[in-house]
Design a protein with these regions (language model features):
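ATP-binding N-terminal substructure of ATP-dependent carboxylate-amine bond-forming enzymes
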Residues: 1-82
Length: 82
């Protein structure tokens, strides 16, 4: 299964460390170019509301989850529409 994660920090890294042995593949969207989770999957560096990054994440992922709770509602609506 391919999992998209909004956020690429410590929690996203721990999620990937737990999921990779189960055969899960990950993509992370984070504004920081050096997000620590990027080492464990596909790293998408960009703002959370960047349409191109969101589309790329949606193309990759079968399911999307969040690393943190402050994701703009418009972002989740855009992903849900895909």
């Amino acid at each position: 299964m391919k999992v998209g994660v909004l956020g690429g920090g410590q929690l996203a890294r721990m999620l990937a460390l737990a999921g990779r042995p189960l055969g899960l593949d990950f993509a992370f969207l984070d504004p920081a170019a050096d997000a620590c989770a990027f080492a464990l999957g596909r790293g998408l560096q960009g703002d959370y509301d960047d349409p191109a990054c969101l589309d790329e994440l949606a193309e990759f992922a079968e399911v999307v989850t969040f690393e943190f709770e402050n994701v703009p509602a418009a972002v989740t609506e855009r992903l849900a529409a895909r």
